[in-house]
């Protein structure tokens, strides 16, 4: 069982479209029951647990892959499902932080940024998604023990080729079209952002505050970039550069990429509606910390 830890603003939505097309009805965008979800609406603290996974398995016979914002390697899935194999993508912490701010803040004045960057729940997001607490050393320990593959948003195409080799899934389709792009959104908050001068994000003061808010994330990211990712590249059995170019050629000529109709229908018309009425089991909203 593969489990994708979807960390916000790391190109995870694009990767999820790849997993949907590659695994079909053996893939589930796993979600929490509505009542459980509301307890962690802001920082997504609740974890997918064994009951959530069992519920998905009952609806998805042959389930081989799950993905979601609430999939966490510290949340107990590994003890309930010893064969589960976690993977994720990380992104440069400052770039990811700014992207999340621009996507979620709602108001984009300098004062709004001051409030955002002062809110501890926004700090060290990637570290907390891995470890449940803003401690890079703990996240590194969990990665060493439980997370078997980590891609990098900054090396997305190369990471997709490496991921395909690691998954060893015959139906893997690495071609993609980027989704959930900020420039394509037209929510009221996006119109507000477009009307606001966000040049303050490029000032030395803002960069310093962002760095301070993501100090543990930076330690984690540096560890992955210098220790984990190079090992994955070294272990690749083929000519990685050539295979990346082949993926890029296929991307340019692929046209529109459609998810198979039946998995999309099942996810939207069967699985999601069922979650409105599902009762949460153990409340894991207190697992880990949100600081």
What kind of feature is each model-predicted range?
Residues 11, 92, 217:
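Short, conserved catalytic/metal-binding motifs centered on acidic residues
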Residues 16-20, 94, 98, 160-164, ...:
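Non-transmembrane alpha-helical segments in soluble domains
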Residues 2-47:
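N-terminal pre-catalytic "stem/leader" segment of glycosyltransferase-like enzymes
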Residues 2-7, 85, 147-155, 205-212:
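Conserved aromatic-histidine-acidic binding/catalytic patches
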Residues 24, 105-106, 226:
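Residue-level marker of structural boundaries
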Residues 29, 36-201, 238-239, 275-276, ...:
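PAPS-dependent sulfotransferase catalytic domain
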Residues 183-291:
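PAPS-dependent sulfotransferases, especially Golgi type II membrane carbohydrate sulfotransferases
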